[in-house]
Amino acid sequence: MKMNSKQPRKQRKFLYNAPLHVRQKMMSAPLSKELREKYKVRNLPVRVGDKVRIMRGDFKGYEGKVVEVDLKRYRIYVEGVTLRKVNGTEVFYPIHPSNVMIIELNLDDEKRKKIIERRAG
């Protein structure tokens, strides 16, 4: 499904109705300078197990592993970034992937290694 429209309403519609394989690509975050030099890639989709640094918002400066990627809500959940509810339980704070920087990649998946090699050129 190719997106050619500049109309904000159609851009929003595409975002809301995007299939999961397209949403995964939209969940990209920039890599740190060290990783960028090492892998020759500027950004990658965030995955569970990646270590990220939060760059914007109330939790700016926090670092932790990604524990969940929520494709439905376009949010990620980071270890150690929690809020306490009134009843005392801890809940993860949802963060948009554009507000984080990947500082360590989870390379357990062979397919991901191949994706990085392919994108590096």
Curated annotation (Swiss-Prot):
Superkingdom of the source species: Archaea
GO cellular component, one term: large ribosomal subunit
Matching SMART domains: KOW
Entry's Gene Ontology molecular function annotations: rRNA binding; structural constituent of ribosome
Keyword terms, alphabetized: Ribonucleoprotein, Ribosomal protein, RNA-binding, rRNA-binding
Assembly and interaction partners: Part of the 50S ribosomal subunit.
Record-given protein name: Large ribosomal subunit protein uL24
Taxonomic source organism: Pyrococcus horikoshii (strain ATCC 700860 / DSM 12428 / JCM 9974 / NBRC 100139 / OT-3)
Gene assigned in the entry: rpl24
